[in-house]
UniProtKB/Swiss-Prot annotation:
Residue segments, region Disordered: 28-75
Record's keyword terms, sorted: Conjugation, Plasmid, Signal
InterPro entries linked: Conjugal_tfr_protein_TrbK, TrbJ/K_C
Protein name: Conjugal transfer protein TrbK
Organism: Rhizobium radiobacter (Agrobacterium tumefaciens)
Taxonomic superkingdom: Bacteria
Biased amino acid composition, Basic and acidic residues: 61-75
NCBIfam families from the UniProt entry: TrbK_Ti (TIGR04361)
Signal peptide per UniProt: 1-20
Length: 75
């Protein structure tokens, strides 16, 4: 085998090992060590998400929006 082929195979092996390690790291999220101070993040429940969405996008239901101010161009 030529030295060029050996170098290419070695680089491919390093890239494959690195990508496998990164894929494993992303797939298997490591748990924080006990007592490390890293708090586990809890995802909000669907009820909390719905309440937040209604509060953010809800608007004022008592406000009259018909016949509002005329929009005029600035130029």
């Amino acid at each position: 085998m030529s030295s060029r082929l050996i170098v290419i195979l070695a680089l491919l092996a390093v890239v494959a090992a690195a990508s496998a390690g990164i894929g494993t790291w992303i797939t298997v999220q490591p748990e924080p060590a006990s007592g490390s101070g890293a708090a586990a993040t809890d995802t909000p429940s669907s009820e909390e998400r719905r309440r937040h969405r209604d509060q953010f996008f809800g608007g004022d239901s008592n406000r009259e929006i018909r016949g509002g101010q005329e929009m005029k161009p600035r130029w």
